[in-house]
Amino acid sequence: HDIGHGPFSHVLEDTIVKGVSHEEISLILMERMNKEMNGQLSLAIQIFKDEYPKRFLHQLVSGQLDMDRLDYLRRDSFYTGVTEGNLGSARIIKMLDVADDRLVIESKGIYSIENFLTARRLMYWQVYLHKTSVAYERMLISTLLRAKELASKGVELFASPALRFFLYNDINHQEFYHNPDCLENFIQLDDNDIWTALKVWSTHPDKVLSTLSLGMINRNIFKVEIS
């Protein structure tokens, strides 16, 4: 259900794309694919939108114990080397059951759920809200907002065709639904579009843009002040 994420996860949602969440983009993509596949995704879309009679299926997609969380905790634990996120997801899945159309856990699986909650909290402390992660995200948001501001003033900026589309056009919720170019360009974006732009922007005459871009490349990032 995260196919609507852009480069660097949530960064684009409030910078070069306004007023549309990655969940909404995911749904637009699914509905488009559903048309191309002659309705074969209709059931999946119903579950995604929580419109399917068996409501517990939506909890597997989006809930406090959904498959997304079980997936990203293990994956991020592996790639960051932070072992606390390496939980026993197979055990949790095995302990799942359904009662009154809701997901429940067998009593002998409570310990596994406690481990899951602890793992998620520790991963937020050590990875997702780590000062370096937060600083990089804030700098990238500031960089893209500055690039968007310059683009709105007609300043020429290097960008891939897909990134240029979003920098030089005001894209909102309605545009994504009614302008097919939005979706076409969005699915072409990946992390490489951003990194390549940052390298070129690091020598741009605009000091704000070049300083932010160079800081990202050289890891000269903002400091986090805790008060």
Where are the model-predicted features located?
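Histidine-centered, transition-metal-coordinating active-site segments
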Residues: 3, 7-227
